[in-house]
Amino acid sequence: MSINVVQINSGDLIGRRFNGYDLKPYLHSHDVNSTQLVYWNKQSDADFVSKAFDYPGNRYVTRGFMQFEQKLSMHARIQPHSWTLPYHQKMRKADLAHLHIIHDGWLSLSALPFMSRLKPTVWTWHDPWAMTGHCIYPIQCSRWQHGCGSCPDLNLPFSMRKDKTAEQFAWKKKVYAKTKAEIVVASEWMCDMVSKSPLAEGFNVTVIPFGLDLERYKPADKAAARDRLGVFAGRPVIFIRSSSTPFKGLSEFVKAIEQLDSDIRLCIISLQETGHFDRFMGKHQIIEFGWSNDENLLLDAYAACDFFAMPSMAEAFGLMAIEAMACARPVLSFEGTSLPGISFAPEAGVSVPHGDITALARAIELLVRNPADCEGRGKLSRTLAERHYDIRDQARLTADLYKRVLSRDKRSGSVA
């Protein structure tokens, strides 16, 4: 008997590798029919994707409530349309709802008890926001373990004007106490956070790592990729996502490049934002893609590089890390995030103390000056990706979870 599941998310094609979009055909092989409801970024014309809310002026209304929440120093609490979501046709037809990115302002978490009473619910925590008083990542702060309040940084996303983090934390606790949902996280690092969170008490938690199509993400000819991208001959190549988001560690990486020995001449390939490496032009070759959804370009970048730098100050999983591993490239990261575990440092990946710029520079030099070691780490990374990050395994584990949840919950698949 097949299972009908609706994936509820902020967007479809943006984040498709972790929001259930790419998982659909693999779930189908396990008798799971998956559809999607999205809000901010519906880009696909596929018939299995629909807008969560489509009434006239809904975005103006949503943004208006978000601005009101910002003035009151709260987030994801009001949005009255949230209580109508269970009556959407795709929700009514589904046996189970799987929540993904629902915390970027368009949905009220206050509706979760109502929604989960009407429909068996799985909720993937893609980041720690569900466990904090306001921030997506608490970085080095531990107040999320004790109810928040006296917040050390209200400017972290999602920012607050006044410190109402303790109030927001207490509100979440009340909501969660009335919510029946199975929580999914993608890394042991996140699972460890969940085990320490007062807000997660009472929830069952399952770890399901994200996966890739390993026939698509695989080792490729380095020389050919470098020719296509125009890499100067003889240059060690580093690939990095250049995001100025405070969690991504770009400024730390730039400072580490400044500390490299003067004889090192690199090629730095960057994806997303441009201009961050202008100061190095003339010494290092800089190849900037800007923002791109071109998967072939991404695969060329992985093939061309010697290693992938992901110096995030906070990271709940790191999908680009496993993409690099699948392409036989080791990952360089900071400790204190999920990445050393995801990249299997120190055997395959390389990690350095959290925020230590000098240690990051020395690690870059070590990888650059020891190409045989770098290549060996890359080969091991591919082996580990095959063992742990196959999208077929993700689909199997996800389908098994759906079946377990439904076997424990005999409610009807309809809210009518």
PLM ranges: what are they?
Residues 195, 211-228, 234, 278-279, ...:
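Acidic anion/phosphate-binding donor-loop and adjacent secondary structure
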Residues 330-333:
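Short hydrophobic beta-strand element within catalytic cores of glycosyltransferases
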